[in-house]
Structure formats: structure tokens, C-alpha cells
Amino acid sequence: MELTKNQVSMTKGVAILFMLLLHLFCTKNYIGLFQPTVMIGDTPLIYYFALFGDCCVAMYCFCSGYGLMSSYDKDTVGYKKNNLMRIFKLYLNFWIILIVFVLIIGPLLGMRNHYPGSFKAFILTLTAIDPAYNGAWWFLTTYILLVLTSPYLNKSIKKYHPIIILGISGIFYFIAYIQRIKGVLQLDLEWLNWLIRQVALYGTSQLPYVVGILFCHYKWYSKLNVFYQKLRFRNAFGISIIILMVIGHGIVQTLFVAPFIGITFICIFNLLYKPLWLEKVFLYFGKHSTNLWLIHMFFYMIYFKELVFAPKYPILIFTWLIILCLISSYVINFFYHPLLRILDHFTKKRIGFENKSYKLESVE
């Protein structure tokens, strides 16, 4: 049994919750921000859970690679056109958020000098060439590049042995990680530094993405599931592995291990038995994951920091941020979904996309 569409969506739901947890509480300078309820020495316990959440991007990359490879196998001929439409839908979603949070809310709060600020910054953000305003938007450019290069990655994975693919991807990841963290290569030309940065971000994101493609192509999850089902205390085993990873990452506090933790967590999470109500919760967050990714930083850091941290205690702060983001997500979708329907009608009428192959779906 391979990963289903619902399982991938649930995984994205967990990933976005990890992202919020990471950005809220992965700091030891908590005084004035929140009141920890449990301490381990001088460090809040919530810090270690938040640190574990740094695998969120790797999880999303894995899901994207897995999903796109599945789409590639189903419709190789129309794959590139589907990808272009997928990217355009993401742009459409992003532009609505850009208008609401940068062009409207920024000036209303008296922050016009920075939101939107200069025309150059706005255009570079609008095109996703070099997004400003929101630190979480860096992944927008990287994701678009991953989607655009996915046909070539898919072909390579079908052609070459997985050990060769993993070796090349691993070396690329290692070099890109050093550049991203240490900034070894710095040049005088702005556009070259931008290019180097994008290559580094792409390089640190492509490893879990490639592993996701490999999982789909070689059906590794099915093989893992066969082994897992033979275990007597399956859930206890899986939860124990997750706890050990949280402890291990608390000892080895480096972003370098994030892809390996993320990939392992995805496998265990989907193998675990979960009650139906819990699956529905994760599916719900999976559907809103794109909006939550693109807007959450406006609340906890840029515009409404004091409001978000007002509840003081981590569980209340976390819940409050989720509520604020979900309300905003519904507002965004109020505009986004009708535009998708208009676009769906236009593309089928003017471009002749087949209804079955090119039916538009929300980017969630």
C-alpha cells in the first residue's frame, strides 16, 4: 500500500503545525515573550519540541516530490502543462495574500515605508524572484524551481540507480548546506549573490524532495509497511522512535539533520494507527497549509506580535495563532476559490484543457 492523497495531505497538516511551533518557541530568549510551564535546566521543554519542528520544510518537500512523481506516472504527456498551472495557482493564492497583508494592512497600520516599501521590492516579491516582507516566503522561489525541474529529476530517477541518485543528491545537499549556513562564497555583484543563494536554498531542499520521488517510484513505503505490520506493538514502537528523535535532535541541535528526521517522521507518522477524528484534524490543517505558511509570520512577528503572545503560556499562544491564521485563511479562500472557478472555465474554453486531466484544484 502506497501513500494515499489523504495521507500526503495529513502529513502537510502536521508539517504546518511544526512550522508554527518552530517559529513561535524555538528560542531560549523567551523572557518577555512567553511563560514556560516546564523547564529542563534553564531551557523550556517547549523549545525542544519546537526545535524538532525544523523538519517542516523537509516534510513538505518530500510530500511534493512524492505527489509530483505520482502525477508524472499518471500523465507524462500533460505533466509540464499541469505543473505550469500548479505554479500559476500558487501565484494566484500568493498574490491575494500579498494584496491583503502588504498593500492593505501594511499602510493601514502606518507601515507604508516598509509594506509595500520600494517598487523594486514589491515587483521582486510579486514575481517571487526575491520575496521580501515575510521571512517564510523564501521557500516560494525554491518550490517553484523544484516544480519546474521536476520533469528532469523524474526522468533521471527512472534512468539511474537509486544509490547514484542519492549519492549525487547527498553531495549537493552537503555543499549547499555549508553555503547556506556559512556563506562561504560571497561576490560583489548583487544578482550573482542572489543566484548563489537560490542554488543553496534549492540544494538544501532537493534532498527530501528527491527521496520523496524515490519513495513513489520504487514503492519503498509499501515495503516498509510490510515490515512494520509484522511488529507486535506497532504504535508503541513508532512513538518510541519519534521520542528518541526528539531527544536526539535536542542533543544534536543542527538544521543539517532536518531532512533525515523529517523523512523518518513521515514514514512513522503514516504507519501509526490514528483514530478517524485525529486524521480529520490533520486533513483540515493540510487543506489550509499553504495559507498558514504564507500568512503566519505577519501575525507573530510583523504586525501583531503583542496580540499573538498576549496569552503568555505556550499552549494558549499556539492555539491563538492557529485561530488567527485560520480566520485569515477563510478570508483568503473567499477570494481565491471564485477566482479558481473563473480560471477553470477560462482555461477549458480558451485553451482546451481536457476536463479530466486539467481540472483545477485549490493549492492546499
Located regions from the model:
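Membrane-cytosol interface segments of multi-pass membrane proteins
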Residues: 1-174, 276, 288, 309-364
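Aromatic-anchored segments of alpha-helical transmembrane domains
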Residues: 17-25, 103, 126-129, 167-183, ...
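Interfacial loop-to-helix transition and helix-capping segments at the boundaries
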Residues: 45-57, 127-142, 179-211, 244-266, ...
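Short juxtamembrane and helix-loop transition motifs at transmembrane-helix boundaries
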Residues: 79, 97-105, 122-132, 188-194, ...
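Alpha-helical transmembrane segments of multi-pass integral membrane proteins
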Residues: 103, 209, 237-347
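Alpha-helical transmembrane segments in multipass membrane proteins, preferentially the mid-helix core
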Residues: 146-155, 210-225, 264-279
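Membrane-interfacial entry segments at the cytosolic side of transmembrane helices
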Residues: 159-166, 226-236
